């Protein structure tokens, strides 16, 4: 999982 996907704007999974 990633904080935030730059290419696909979506809700962050784990911060």
Curated annotation (Swiss-Prot):
Protein name according to UniProt: Cysteine-rich venom protein Bco13
Gene Ontology CC: one annotated term: extracellular region
Tissue: Expressed by the venom gland.
Record-level Gene Ontology MF annotations: calcium channel regulator activity; toxin activity
Keyword Secreted: yes
Subcellular localization: Secreted
Post-translational events: Contains 8 disulfide bonds.
Keywords: Calcium channel impairing toxin, Disulfide bond, Ion channel impairing toxin, Neurotoxin, Secreted, Toxin
Family: Belongs to the CRISP family.
Functional description taken from the UniProt entry: Weakly blocks contraction of smooth muscle elicited by high potassium-induced depolarization, but does not block caffeine-stimulated contraction. May target voltage-gated calcium channels on smooth muscle.
Spans traversing the lipid bilayer: none
Main location class: secreted
